[in-house]
């Protein structure tokens, strides 16, 4: 069975791989600087077709580069329902990365389908789906204690329908939920990532209340909910698991 050479007719990039035949087993990667490499599992969920899986790393600007981290193997074949591994290996040049904060990369994987049957009389549009997940390089100096929730250090202030999110930590904080309650996000809200020691603004739309539910993503990609009370100085409090 042959595979398409070059770019397919249509390329779709998605963040979580939810519609892809070949999917990674996680939605984010934390690479601890003390480790030589980190691994993730990929799976071909197709019952009938083999796929090629093409993997590479991009920096924060979306530029493809293997100068700091490299994905191995860069390309591999997965038979139907087969699983395999991709190793992300650090290069010696990672010593040049900041030691006082995380650095953001992206792991990308593009599935390449087999070429269509040439004997078919029907026109076929093939779509190559590309998964893209965040990869956080965590310096050796940053060590979270068991159960530590650095996300609760997020500093929030409210002015009208605008929330200012200030991250005083050395970690990337991803705010994936903002709502009046736990039943749904505010209309128009989009996930916000706040880089270490930086500030980002987000809009609350037509909602002018002072109480919110705010959800952040932990190291394992799980959504953790907090309550946010902005009567005076905004205060974050973790929501206890039910």
UniProtKB/Swiss-Prot annotation:
A Pfam family reported for this protein in Swiss-Prot or TrEMBL: PapD_N
Main location: periplasm
InterPro entries linked: Ig-like_fold, PapD-like_sf, Periplasmic_pilus_chap, Pili_assmbl_chap_C_dom_sf, Pili_assmbl_chaperone_bac, Pili_assmbl_chaperone_C, Pili_assmbl_chaperone_CS, Pili_assmbl_chaperone_N
Gene Ontology, cellular component aspect: outer membrane-bounded periplasmic space
Keywords, in A-Z order: Chaperone, Fimbrium biogenesis, Immunoglobulin domain, Periplasm, Signal
Signal peptide positions on this chain: 1-20
Family: Belongs to the periplasmic pilus chaperone family.
Role played: Could be required for the biogenesis of the putative YbgD fimbria.
Protein name: Uncharacterized fimbrial chaperone YbgP
Gene, per the UniProt record: ybgP
């Amino acid at each position: 069975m042959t595979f398409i050479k070059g770019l397919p007719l249509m390329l779709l990039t998605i963040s979580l791989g939810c519609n892809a035949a070949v999917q990674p087993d996680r939605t984010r990667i934390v690479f601890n600087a003390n480790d030589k490499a980190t691994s993730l599992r990929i799976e071909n969920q197709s019952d009938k077709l083999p796929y090629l899986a093409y993997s590479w790393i991009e920096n924060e600007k979306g530029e493809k580069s293997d100068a700091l981290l490299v994905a191995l193997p860069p390309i591999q074949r997965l038979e139907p329902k087969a699983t395999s591994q991709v190793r992300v290996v650090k290069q010696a040049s990672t010593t040049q990365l900041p030691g006082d904060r995380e650095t953001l990369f992206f792991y990308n994987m593009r599935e390449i389908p087999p070429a269509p049957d040439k004997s078919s009389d029907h026109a076929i549009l093939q779509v190559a789906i590309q998964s893209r997940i965040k990869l956080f390089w965590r310096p050796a100096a940053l060590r979270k204690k068991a159960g530590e929730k650095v996300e609760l250090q997020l500093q929030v202030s409210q002015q009208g329908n605008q929330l200012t999110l200030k991250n005083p930590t050395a970690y990337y904080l991803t705010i994936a939920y903002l709502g009046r309650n736990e039943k749904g996000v505010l209309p128009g809200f989009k996930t916000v990532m706040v880089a270490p020691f930086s500030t980002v603004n987000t809009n609350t739309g037509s909602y002018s209340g002072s109480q919110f539910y705010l959800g952040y993503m932990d190291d394992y990609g799980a959504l953790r909910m907090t309550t946010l009370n902005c009567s005076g100085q905004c205060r974050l409090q973790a929501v206890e698991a039910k």
